[in-house]
């Protein structure tokens, strides 16, 4: 897997792009990423994970990161992605307008963009799936729930870890968490 900085101007002749913070690369994230790999193979193009580091919740709300950037990239490679684009999330990136993000994605020539149901982007989370669909074909991966019916999320996994429920957090992640 090739790793690129978001500001390097990567261009591809065609791709399927999965977008997200992917903190923890939990089972919900894995569903999004696997869908990107599967669709890219079906369409004969490269698969791309576009991620931000650190995750916004960690940067601005002080939440614990579940995975380092390297751990995240290692998981992407295991899942079979061809490329990872890493945007370094800071105040400047957070202030980006939605059109700047759309322009950046356009260079990847996405045949499809794959996101989770709650995907938002741009300054103040102004961009949504409807806006993304005006520019690209978008596929939304349904929320992944655990056996008790609750949504799998990085926030929920953090809460389990804080309570010392390591076994349950590992189940939701789908792989062992580094300490």
UniProtKB/Swiss-Prot annotation:
Pathway(s) where this gene product acts: Cofactor biosynthesis; FAD biosynthesis; FAD from FMN: step 1/1; Cofactor biosynthesis; FMN biosynthesis; FMN from riboflavin (ATP route): step 1/1
A Gene Ontology molecular function term of the record: FMN adenylyltransferase activity
GO biological process annotation, one example: FMN biosynthetic process
Domain of life: Bacteria
Keyword Nucleotidyltransferase: yes
Top-level EC class as recorded in UniProt: transferase
The protein's Enzyme Commission number: 2.7.1.26, 2.7.7.2
Gene3D superfamilies (UniProt xref): HUPs
Keywords for the protein's UniProt record, in alphabetical order: ATP-binding, FAD, Flavoprotein, FMN, Kinase, Multifunctional enzyme, Nucleotide-binding, Nucleotidyltransferase, Transferase
Database matches in InterPro entries: FAD_synthase, Riboflavin_kinase, Rossmann-like_a/b/a_fold
UniProt catalytic activity: riboflavin + ATP = FMN + ADP + H(+); FMN + ATP + H(+) = FAD + diphosphate
Annotated function: Catalyzes the phosphorylation of riboflavin to FMN followed by the adenylation of FMN to FAD.
Family: Belongs to the RibF family.
Name of the protein in question: Putative bifunctional riboflavin kinase/FMN adenylyltransferase
Gene symbol of the encoding locus: ribF
């Amino acid at each position: 897997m090739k790793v690129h900085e978001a500001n390097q101007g990567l261009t591809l002749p065609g791709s399927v792009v999965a977008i997200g913070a992917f903190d923890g690369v939990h089972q919900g994230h894995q569903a999004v990423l696997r869908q990107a790999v599967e669709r890219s193979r079906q369409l004969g193009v490269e698969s791309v994970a576009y991620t931000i580091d650190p995750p916004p919740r960690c940067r601005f709300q002080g939440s614990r990161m579940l995975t380092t950037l390297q751990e995240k990239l290692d998981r992407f490679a295991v899942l079979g992605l061809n490329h990872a684009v890493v945007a370094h999330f800071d105040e400047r990136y957070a202030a980006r307008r939605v059109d700047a993000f759309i322009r950046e994605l356009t260079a990847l020539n996405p045949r499809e963009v794959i996101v989770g149901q709650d995907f938002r982007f741009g300054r103040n989370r102004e961009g949504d799936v409807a806006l993304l669909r005006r520019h690209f074909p978008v596929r939304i991966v349904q929320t992944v729930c655990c056996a008790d019916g609750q949504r799998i999320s990085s926030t929920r996994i953090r809460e389990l870890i804080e309570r010392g429920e390591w076994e349950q957090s590992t189940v939701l992640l789908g792989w062992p968490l580094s300490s």
